[in-house]
């Protein structure tokens, strides 16, 4: 069966079992039951509680909750074993660490819920774009109905300003133009017609933007009027297909999520293995299989679990991302999904829509031929666009460009019309591609005719040359067409204007009577100009190893011209159309996309295919756009970038990031910020894991030697207080000098890539050695002669614990200074991180407070230490800086080789 746009109006009406007068009310009610209301499906709403539970699926949080549960259980069991009367303080002290862990879990979950993207907002935004009311023919009469009541077979009346309520076939047309940019990406409104369309040779389908006898839900009538018979409603419309594609596109994890999930799994296996080993080792070594002995051994294992898990990591990552989001929003990049920030940092391809993204979405006259003032005034008068009170042109975009052209030359449309009022016209018709207006001037009449250069020139018998009317010769005709071709080669849309003078008002206003024996005045070439800042932004993208790609619904010539101007491509061989794309299989497409930088005349499904092909090439892909047509591909991309000003609500709600200023250059800033944030998160991760490594090795080694280095609550304090503040401060480091001159990182690189794993291990060992040394010195101060034997016998030393706690805290505080750069010497960094200095001082004061405030010292089980011990701890801890600086020096030397 022939497609609707290939059928005549009679065939379409017959196929839908309707007439040009519309359906009867009774028949419409039957069809409403059959097809359902003309609206888009609503997405399933996710409750706040369900969103909260989804946050708790994070592996890191699961490990923390298990650790909290085990700690709580052992504390309660241990408390129940105490003789009566039991000391409630023992229970409270044991549950402190449980409470701290649960607060961390709760905080992360709440932050996740607040930041989480609301998927159903996309469908709701699509619904708001559909017309609320529409004019429908029912029982042969025009009635106003809610758009949801429309059914296939209904005949709707469309006028300028109306939103098209459903997909339809045009059956009556009076110079109607429909703006379809949101669906097709083409900025110029489409001149509609009623004739059936035919396929050209080798064509299997007519692209959406070329179906001139069709109209689609979500588009807007900008000129003329007409009637259309509804062919599809609701989810069967083109808009509905987009909504359905959005619903079917599955969410993928960002690289950071994958890395943190991987880290969570590694830590869970590590914790399980170490805990089982220590539990078994202690039981066998001590030979104490009583409940008390088992619980004591179990608490040692819990200590190791607490030591192994960086409790502050999830919070630090979330807060660093949140701070980055705030900073980006101040630069007009609004992040809608928290973990998507770092995805920008490894973006390798940016697929960008043209209209409104790379260009201004504002047709502008950029070149003219002939007397510029006369051409401008004539074209402004021969148009239906007008200037509002703010001198902004309103109307069809092409005519707005002509009115603005005259205005820039000092000729306002209203002033021109006051001097030469319009008295008659022959409206534009897509068949003849012209329009004419007749104006009264000084007791006579002048007619202006504008349209396509070929059709206007064919009706000219003379031309204006140096203010004189001279006969049109073949030589002059060739000159005019050469000027037209020169403009067209630049992808300009060219219009011609001519005039005819009358001593009396023409008796006939038919085109056949008016549009002959014309005097050619000139040409005007217009284009949707590029945004002035985009070219520099694209150069910066290339410098950062990112490939920009243009994907548009516009014509190939226009797209190529814009892309060449911006530096996206070098020649037309790097451009391909949607029709040509259809001939390439999904299997071959990933290889083909590498060849092209411009995709023209594409439809929504093409955009999704292109983005998917780049992803199959293992390239982290971003997609920018503003129209509804961009929404599925934006959601398919690793990171979708919507436009805040010109963007539709559906695009903004699907996007991971929205550019508040619609500025392509903001993407470059966002990419740099994404790289900075990821670099800083790696610094924080390295710092926290090195700290945890030192705790694990210290507790593990001390257990093997027969004494307790630190208790779980001590480790939690270090992890959540001493470490967290410097880690957060590291997340606020300024970008390093090479941030935007190095290639994007490989998204497959693990969290320990680039030598981070080695750094964590050696730095963890370094802090362990320093901490154990401090513990042993403290124990020797407590036990005096033969201190090691006494320590083994006692199994612990309050003095040693105090020294270990102080030294480990100081060591990690000083180590945070090292972490300002993974490879560069911190003494060569030009920027100053004042927040880090404050964090280091704050952590040091809090650590000292625990040791010096009596009730805290008692609660933590510490002994009072003097200035000598403080001096020893400081001397030991500060050695971490020169040692790490020396290793960095060696690493830089190796890297150069």
For each predicted feature, which ranges?
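Core segments of transmembrane alpha-helices
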Residues: 694-695, 759-771
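Generic alpha-helical transmembrane segments
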Residues: 722, 799-816
């Amino acid at each position: 069966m022939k497609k609707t746009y290939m059928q005549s109006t009679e065939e379409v009406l017959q196929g839908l079992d309707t007439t040009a007068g519309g359906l009867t009310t009774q028949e419409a009610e039957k069809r409403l039951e059959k097809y359902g209301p003309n609206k888009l499906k609503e997405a399933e709403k996710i409750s706040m509680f369900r969103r909260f539970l989804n946050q708790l699926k994070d592996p890191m949080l699961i490990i923390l909750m298990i650790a909290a549960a085990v700690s709580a259980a052992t504390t309660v069991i241990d408390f129940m074993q105490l003789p009566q009367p039991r000391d409630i303080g023992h229970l409270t002290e044991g549950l402190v660490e449980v409470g701290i862990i649960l607060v961390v879990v709760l905080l992360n979950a709440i932050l996740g819920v607040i930041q989480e993207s609301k998927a159903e907002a996309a469908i709701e935004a699509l619904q708001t774009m559909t017309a609320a009311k529409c004019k429908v023919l029912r029982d042969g009469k025009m009635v106003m109905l809610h758009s949801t009541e429309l059914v296939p077979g209904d005949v709707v009346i469309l006028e300028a300003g109306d939103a098209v309520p459903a997909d339809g076939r045009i059956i009556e047309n009076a110079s109607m133009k429909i703006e379809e940019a949101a669906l097709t990406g083409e900025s110029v409104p489409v001149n509609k017609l009623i004739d059936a369309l035919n396929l050209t040779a080798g064509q299997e389908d007519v692209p959406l933007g070329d179906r001139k006898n069709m109209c689609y839900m979500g588009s807007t009538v900008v000129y003329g009027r007409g009637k259309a018979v509804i062919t599809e409603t609701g989810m069967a419309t083109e808009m509905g297909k987009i909504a359905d594609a959005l619903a079917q596109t599955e969410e993928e994890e960002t690289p950071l999520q994958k890395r943190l999930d991987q880290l969570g799994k590694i830590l869970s296996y590590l914790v399980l293995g170490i805990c089982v080993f220590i539990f078994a080792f202690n039981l066998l070594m001590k030979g104490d299989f009583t409940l008390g002995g088992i619980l004591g051994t179990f608490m040692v294992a819990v200590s190791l679990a607490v030591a192994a898990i960086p409790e502050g990591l999830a919070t630090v990552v979330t807060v660093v991302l949140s701070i980055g989001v705030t900073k980006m929003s101040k630069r007009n990049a609004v992040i809608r999904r928290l973990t998507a920030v770092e995805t920008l940092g490894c973006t390798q391809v940016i697929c960008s829509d043209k209209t409104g993204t790379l260009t201004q979405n504002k047709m502008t006259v950029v070149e003219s031929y002939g007397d510029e003032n006369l051409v401008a005034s004539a074209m402004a008068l021969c148009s239906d666009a007008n200037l509002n009170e703010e001198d902004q042109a309103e109307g069809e975009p092409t005519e707005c460009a002509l009115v603005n052209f005259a205005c820039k030359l000092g000729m306002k449309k209203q002033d021109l019309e006051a001097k030469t009022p319009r008295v008659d016209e022959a409206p534009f018709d897509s068949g003849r591609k012209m329009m004419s207006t007749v104006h009264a001037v000084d007791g006579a009449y002048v007619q202006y005719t504008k349209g396509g250069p070929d059709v206007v020139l064919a009706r000219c018998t003379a031309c204006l040359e140096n203010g004189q009317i001279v006969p049109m010769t073949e030589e002059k005709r060739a000159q005019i067409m050469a000027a037209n071709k020169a403009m067209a080669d630049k992808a300009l849309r060219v219009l011609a204007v001519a005039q005819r003078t009358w001593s009396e008002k023409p008796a006939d206003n038919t085109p056949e009577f008016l549009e002959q024996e014309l005097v050619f005045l000139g040409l005007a070439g217009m284009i949707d100009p590029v945004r002035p800042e985009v070219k520099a932004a694209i150069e910066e993208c290339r410098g950062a190893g990112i490939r920009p790609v243009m994907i548009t619904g516009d014509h190939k010539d226009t797209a190529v011209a814009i892309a060449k101007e911006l530096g996206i491509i070098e020649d037309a061989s790097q451009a391909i159309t949607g029709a040509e794309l259809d001939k390439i299989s999904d299997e071959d497409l990933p290889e083909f996309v590498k060849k092209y930088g411009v995709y023209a005349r594409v439809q929504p499904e093409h955009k999704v295919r292109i983005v998917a092909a780049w992803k199959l090439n293992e390239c982290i892909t971003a997609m920018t756009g503003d129209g509804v047509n961009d929404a599925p591909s934006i959601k398919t991309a690793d990171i979708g970038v919507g436009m805040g000003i010109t963007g539709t609500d559906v695009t903004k709600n699907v996007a991971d990031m929205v550019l508040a200023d619609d500025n392509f250059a903001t993407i470059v800033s966002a990419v740099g910020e994404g790289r900075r944030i990821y670099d800083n998160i790696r610094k924080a991760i390295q710092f926290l894991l090195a700290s945890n490594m030192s705790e694990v090795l210290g507790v593990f080694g001390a257990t093997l030697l027969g004494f307790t280095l630190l208790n779980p609550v001590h480790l939690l304090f270090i992890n959540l207080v001493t470490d967290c503040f410097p880690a957060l401060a590291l997340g606020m480091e300024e970008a390093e000098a090479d941030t935007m001159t190095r290639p994007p990182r490989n998204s497959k690189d693990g969290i320990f890539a680039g030598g981070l794993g080695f750094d964590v291990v050696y730095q963890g060992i370094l802090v362990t050695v320093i901490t154990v040394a401090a513990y042993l010195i403290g124990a020797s101060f407590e036990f005096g002669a033969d201190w090691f034997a006494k320590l083994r016998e006692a199994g612990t030393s309050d003095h040693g614990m105090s020294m270990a706690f102080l030294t480990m805290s100081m060591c990690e505080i000083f180590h945070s200074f090292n972490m300002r750069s993974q490879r560069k010497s911190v003494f060569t960094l030009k920027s100053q991180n004042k927040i880090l200095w404050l964090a280091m001082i704050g952590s040091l004061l809090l650590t000292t407070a625990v040791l010096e405030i009596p009730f805290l010292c008692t609660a933590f089980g510490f002994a009072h230490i003097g200035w000598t011990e403080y001096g020893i701890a400081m001397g030991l801890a500060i050695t971490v800086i020169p040692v790490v600086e020396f290793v960095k020096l060696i690493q830089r030397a190796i890297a150069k080789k």
